[in-house]
Amino acid sequence: MALVAIEKVGQIGIAKETSPWELPSNVWSDGNNVKTDEGSIRKSPGFSEVMATCPIAPYHITQITLGSPEFWVVAGLAKIYCYDNTGTTTTLDGSITSVDTTITVDSTVGFEDVGTITIGSEDIVYTGKTATTFTGATVTESHSDGATVTRSTVWYDITRASGGDYSSTANDTWTSTILGGVLVMTNFYDKPQYWALTNGTVLSSQKMQDLNDWPALTALNGAITGTGVPSPDEIVVDSTLDFPTAGTFTVGTEDISYKGKTSTKFTGIGRGENGTTAATHLDDAAAFITTYCRSMRGFRSFLVALNIKQAGVNFPRVVKWSTEAATQTTPASWNETTSTVDAGEYELADTKGDIMDGMQLRDAFMIYKEDAAYSMTYVGTPFIFAFRQLSPTVGAIATNCIAEFDGGHAIFGKGNFYVNDGQRLKPILPQRLRDYVFTSIDGAQIDKCFVAADYGRTEILFCFTADGAASVEPNKAVVWNYITNTFTMKDIPNVAHMGYGNVGDPVLPSTWASASTSWATITGPWTMSYALQDKVLLFADPVSTKLYRDRSGNKKDTALMTSYVERTGLALNAQGQPDFTGVKRISAIYPKMSVNGSNSMTVYLGTSMSTEGGYDWKDAVLFNPDTQSKVSVRGTGKFYAVKFESSTDMDWELDGYALEIDNAGNRGSREY
């Protein structure tokens, strides 16, 4: 009888659906809710609700930080909210009573110019501030010198003030980008939105706005009276600069056609086009061509719009770019017909697929269609940008399916995951894992696939809705560690999108006094300051209307998490050599692992007499590495299997294991 060791069990990860007897002994044939970590395999961290209570069903989340405060921006289908993540407090400098309208504090840094503060149990509205005072305050109670003052409201509705609610859908949801510190978002059904800066920072009192000078926008220079064709047959506006020579524009809810234009007039007018109703319109009313785009991304000091819909007509292969924007502002023009600005457009017409998305990669901008990939590089006037096809066959499966990392772009493509290093696109999924992923995806929910990067863990998450899932939102992620090139899998909670940034861990105690656990049981970092600054993924779950912080605790929010790794097809004999004909007798498993607290793992042994037969799994055995060194089992077969599983609130790490094996001769292999 010999002890055969299997080490570095996290070196490769999971190769699901591969013929397991062909795998190296330290590769897992199945598993879920696990991750690789420096050659070991360990349980995936849990996730916990944060920023409660989210006022909308969240479909997109991103963080913007420009000094203080720090905001998470959450977009739903109809509205956009921001969450103040700063946690700002100050202290009263002198007592106040109900007659006071000015409140003196140590500092107002991090507080809004207009807002609400809380002292004790009282919420106090104020209308202004200086460096050390809140002014225009309405106080109803008395408060003592030295009392703590905090920002009261953390969720703010920043939906645009004019234009009404948004019209996004769950299939064509939002994208976001930052250009010169300005947040820009779009959704393919509304004009792109931007969050204007005030003195170089963002304020929750500032609403989102329709993107300035987005093609094409002007204002009436004089009212339109009546509902017929005006006399003379023209409509005067401030400028027709960004409008085509003929077409249709919108005023209010009316579509108006024109056959020609001068610098300030549209001529050859047609009223109430496209089934709209002709109406009167006031002087200075907005006149615009309704233009949407599937995605908008920042590149250098340009905005790049991808897959254009204009006046109801889709141009799915068109790329538009703005003129260059000054710092902390949006571009002044998108007019590609004039040589006085750098705006332009180009159609990627050599393949028939739609443009899905794009993203900067070093000094180039990569554009991904359904069926191809392109590089867009700055060349200056007169062309501004040059376009080069990188692949005529590989693209992105949906919008938000690209993540940047040190090695380039990670792309969720059709039929594989790819890495674009700027020169070529390389597939990265092992064959059998690829087969598993693309036979597991719910084909009706492909548009909901997305990719997220967890830079702190050097991981890329490829997220999708598994066939047969209870929800249409993604519930499964393949996790690729791009440093170790390992793959694992995990469950995610009906997530429409993930953002990356700072948010506190609600599971960790905030002070020594509040800690009720021991060093052995706590799973977070020791230093709370790092826990607050460490960036993590935030999950946007529109089904439960919640936001979750990844890497928080060991559970799926409040539910227990089942985590396991399994290896079938092992055929090592007592000499540690693969032997597909000899029968082996397994009498013990020696896990080399650690757990938090006094928790126990569940260990299984399975045996089989052939590659075609199923496994006879023996009874589960509990194993606590603090008090035990081995798991006593009994099984005989030509092939055998092991499984390590947990389903309680615990953390564990498995470095390797050894098997006590005795060669038991040869027998027939066919099972009947």
Can you say where each PLM-predicted feature lies in the sequence?
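Beta-sheet repeat architectures centered on beta-propellers
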Residues: M1-T86, Y156-R160, D165-G181, G353, ...
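Short beta-strand segments and strand-loop junctions that repeat across beta-rich extracellular domains
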Residues: I80-N85, T153, P192-T198, A311-S339, ...
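Hydrophobic or amphipathic alpha-helical targeting/insertion segments
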Residues: T173-P215, M296
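Autoprocessing Asn-cyclization modules and mimics
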Residues: N85-S152, K207-A286
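Structural signature of WD-repeat beta-propellers
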Residues: A75-L77, N187, T253, N307, ...
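Beta-propeller and closely related beta-pinwheel folds
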Residues: P45-H60, D157-T169, L203-A216, T290-C449
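Internal, charge-rich low-complexity segments
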Residues: N85-G94, N199-A216, G501-T517
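Short, surface-exposed terminal/edge motifs of secreted or surface/virion proteins that either
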Residues: F71-T86, D123-V125, A131-G136, D190-K207, ...
